[in-house]
Every structure is written in C-alpha cells, then in structure tokens.
Amino acid sequence: MARKIEFDPEDEEFFGKVGSFGVPKFDNEMHGGVPRGFIMVAFTDTGSGSELFAKQFTSPAEESDNTLYISTNEGQQEIIRIFQKYDWPLDISVRTIGEEYNSTVLERELLASRYRLEGFRLDDIRRLAQTRFVEDNTQDYLTEVTNEIMALGPYFRAVVDSLDFFLQREDPSRVVAMVRMLQAHAQLNR
C-alpha cells in the first residue's frame, strides 16, 4: 500500500488545484494550468522550441528548492543565459546530464580513439601506469534522475528535457518504468 501524505490546508490554499505552465495564454486554454499531481510527456519535433517551453514550465516555481530542471542536451551556461534573458528564477536546481555524460564517457572514448590513431606517447604510458587500466565507471543516469526526482517533496515541479537521451542509451522498458514511477510520485505528492 502506498504511503499517505497529509497536506497542510495552508499549503493547499497557497498552491491551489492547478500549477501554471508558465505561459499565461496556455494556462487560460487549459483552465488555469495543469492539475496538481499530473505528469506531462510532450512529443515534439526538432526545432519546435521544446527546450524553451521546458525551461518556461519551471519558471513559476512556487518553491525553488523543490523545483528541478534536468537537461540532457544543453550546458549550464546556456541554461543560465536563457533564464537571465527571460528573468526567470535562477535559484532552482539544475542538472546537466549531457555535460556530465560528455565529460565522463565521451572524453574517454575520444582519448581511446586518439591512442588508436596516434599510438601512445611516453607521457601517456607514465600516466596510465599510475592509474587503473580498466575503469569501472558505469554510471546509471536513469536511476540517478529517478531517485533525484523521487526525493522531491510535496508540490514539486520537475522537468526532464528530454527522454531521448535515456531512450538512446537504455532499454525503452526501463525508461517507461521510470516515467511510471515518477507519475506515481507526482500523484502522491501532487
């Protein structure tokens, strides 16, 4: 049986029954916003502005410490630049999985390619002799993101931009399971 969360009546009054999309015209069309406890999955075309919409969805963060924006394709500096441009809050939590992946996985692959093409230099051999030759760096970004969002408390707001990163690297059934877990967490913590 799922745990039951008791909501403070003052919180219910403050947060209301719906959360803003961050786009007033869209909020009006959607009768005030998205109902609390709902999860949204948007399927968009490349170049349709989904990254901007994802950021804008975090902008009406009622509690910045309970708001999380996870980007899989943009860097920290680009995200900050956009938030500053539109005067959105900068005190929300941001995680840039794409940057993390590039620095941990792709840099090693690039180095391995260089070794294959150019061979080893004496400095490379000395450096490698001081480290383990086989790195055990299997990072499970999907589980990390799931746990990070599930740690958020009531009335949280989280955006994952985008699921493509996970679908390209994981079994799709694991990604769907993550979305279902997040849906249950959202319903519980509305």
Give the positions of each predicted feature:
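Phosphate-binding/switch loop-helix module in NTP-utilizing enzymes
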Residues: S103-Q183
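Loop/turn-to-beta-strand initiation segments
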Residues: N66, G153-R157, Q187-R190
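AAA+/P-loop NTPase substrate/partner-engagement loops
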Residues: T72-Q84, Y101-N102
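Glycine-rich P-loop/Walker A and Walker A-like loops and their local beta1-loop-alpha1 context
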Residues: P24-Q76
